[in-house]
Amino acid sequence: MEKIIKKLKIMIVEDEEDILILYKDFLSGKGHDVTTTYLDGEDMIEEIDKVKSDIYLIDYRLPGNKNGIEVAIEILNKFPAAPILFITAYENLQKEISKNPVFYDKNVQVLLKPVKLDKIENAMVNLVNKNRIK
């Protein structure tokens, strides 16, 4: 199947500011619209109704009261078809997701850090395209 690459609207939550800036600069440079970025999951949750996004990039370990899984659950409760890409150093995240019924039949993928930036863009495009096919 041919990849359809379009300008994606992206929300990112990543607690390491240098990594957040790296993702934003890379994805913006590829023509995507990084609509909003957050250093903490609670801030992202407060804004998800205000900003339309095609995909959500989420780290697992976040400051505050919510980790990445909890942020993703909040997003999926509001937007059940939302594509979610976890980018994390937490090696057991895939196991945790696979045990949680909230994520069954959802469009979710995990990439482990360190990850090449091109791999992030490819995963995003695949998740968004998968959503279109459903």
Annotate the PLM regions.
Residues 16-36, 41, 108:
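Two-component/phosphorelay signaling modules centered on CheY-like receiver
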Residues 69-80, 100-101:
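Short amphipathic alpha-helix used as the core "switch/output" element in two-component signaling
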Residues 59-61:
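Active-site residues of response regulator receiver
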